[in-house]
UniProtKB/Swiss-Prot annotation:
Its main location: membrane. It comes from the Eukaryota. Forms a heterodimer (via N-terminal transmembrane helix) with SLC5A2/SGLT2 (via TM13); this interaction enhances SLC5A2 transporter activity. Interacts with PDZK1. It is found in: Apical cell membrane. The keyword Repressor does not apply. Residues 1-28 are extracellular. This is PDZK1-interacting protein 1. Auxiliary protein of electrogenic Na(+)-coupled sugar symporter SLC5A2/SGLT2 and SLC5A1/SGLT1. Essential for the transporter activity of SLC5A2/SGLT2 but not SLC5A1/SGLT1. The modification Phosphoserine is found at S85. Residues 105-114 have a biased composition (Basic and acidic residues).
Length: 114
């Protein structure tokens, strides 16, 4: 086995080394730039795809619409049958689906909840 490897090594040493610089010729500068931009865009697309699938947040439950009499209220899944009295305190008198933007004063900062 060692004699065979010595023969192969000798043949490889006798063959002249290949020169990588003697190709068909260098590409034009505009072609190099075009290839560089295309490779960059492919890498960015791969990064966006990985980010989209890897960093996906869990989706929130969709709203259900429950009709009570003449009015439809949006209810989150799992809160059926529970009434929130928070909305009653700032519901508008002008329209049933509008809310008042009540102001709260915190020290010198004037803020509104919406």
């Amino acid at each position: 086995m060692s004699a065979l490897s010595l023969v192969i090594l000798g043949l490889l040493m006798a063959v002249p080394p290949a020169s990588c610089q003697q190709g068909l010729g260098n590409l034009q500068p505009w072609m190099q730039g075009l290839i560089a931009v295309a490779v960059f865009l492919v890498l960015v697309a791969i990064a966006f795809a990985i980010n989209h699938f890897w960093c996906q947040e869990e989706r929130e439950p969709m709203n259900m619409v429950m009709t009570t009499g003449n009015k439809a209220d949006g209810i989150l899944i799992g809160t059926e049958g529970k009434y929130s009295s928070m909305a009653a305190s700032f519901r508008s008198n002008e329209h049933e689906n509008a809310y008042e933007n009540t102001s709260e004063e915190e020290g010198r900062v004037h803020s509104t909840p919406m």
